[in-house]
């Protein structure tokens, strides 16, 4: 019986070329990515990505879950920015429900999302630099990342799979002193950025390995569905936080870094500048954090406070019904997209009026950005494939789902 999804085969051309397998177990593919490479000496003639090694069927699984039970599953898609995935999903459900989210909850979401963006970019910077031989940067980046993971653990109870956002707001009020800890991090982070840039930006070896390497034109980037720093590194000035604001982003002032060269170095510059801009947004959120509730006034959707459950029978009944039966969502369909660290993260949800989604589809930036690889790498040297993969910052859980 024929296999439903046969393994891709790349045949060698004339006797000058040969075919190599890179991955799926390879440290520089940043996950279980397999690349079939046809090479002529050290030059890439053709490249074919082979994905699916991390496929979990998560979209289908969502159809068997209550709407609120899907939130922890979104953490596992792009595991380097779980709160970003949480936000994209809950915004879609809230749009179907027509919920109005309190301003404080929106600002906490923005604050946590920018901390998540910094966290994700630190992993990209540290691992991408190490792929090119810059070991010191990796150690510095993970020094700051550890502080961020401690902040996530303090506010959400988990270092990585946070599940902090809820349909209707956030799960808990940040603990006492948490905002002060975030402020301390944001105040010191620019000096840490200076350290990273001092090691890389003008480093002649790093510049030689990245400038003019793995170029992608803006026409190809648009045609293949690129987004995020991969798109902006090719000269397209587009950021969903600014151009289609959500969760109160229209109240924040920040710049969108854009470069026109389209090479690895341009994408590096975009993300480095983005780290600084995210830090500025964090500082603005801390300075202007509004008072008020962290949950929408929707007792049939949002779990009541535990204190109310102890004294109000109605709250206890609502809690029991939400946990055991879920909440129903009006029939309809919606697409909601946000700007994740890797680009446009979108959720398309179809509701049939029950407590479980009829269909959930995730538009993941890593899957779209991976399509750039053949255009980037054809004609490049074999060693430059590592730099190209690092520059598009893919996460295979985000690709395969």
Curated annotation (Swiss-Prot):
Q: Which Gene3D superfamilies match?
A: Cytochrome-c3 Hydrogenase, chain B
Which Pfam families does the record cross-reference, listed alphabetically? Complex1_49kDa (PF00346)
The record gives the membrane topology as: Peripheral membrane protein
* Primary site of residence: membrane
Keywords from the UniProt entry: Cell inner membrane, Cell membrane, Membrane, NAD, Quinone, Translocase, Transport, Ubiquinone
EC number(s) given by UniProt: 7.1.1.-
Annotated catalysed reactions? a quinone + NADH + 5 H(+)(in) = a quinol + NAD(+) + 4 H(+)(out)
Transport as a keyword?
yes
For this protein, the record's InterPro entries field holds: NADH_Q_OxRdtase_suD, NADH_UbQ_OxRdtase_49kDa_CS, NDH1_su_D/H, NiFe-Hase_large
Question: Where's it found, cell-wise?
Answer: Cell inner membrane
GO CC terms on record? Answer: plasma membrane
For this chain, one GO molecular function annotation is:
NAD binding
* Subunit (UniProt): NDH-1 is composed of 14 different subunits. Subunits NuoB, C, D, E, F, and G constitute the peripheral sector of the complex.
- Name the family the entry cites: Belongs to the complex I 49 kDa subunit family.
Role of this protein: NDH-1 shuttles electrons from NADH, via FMN and iron-sulfur (Fe-S) centers, to quinones in the respiratory chain. The immediate electron acceptor for the enzyme in this species is believed to be ubiquinone. Couples the redox reaction to proton translocation (for every two electrons transferred, four hydrogen ions are translocated across the cytoplasmic membrane), and thus conserves the redox energy in a proton gradient.
The protein depicted here goes by the name: NADH-quinone oxidoreductase subunit D 2
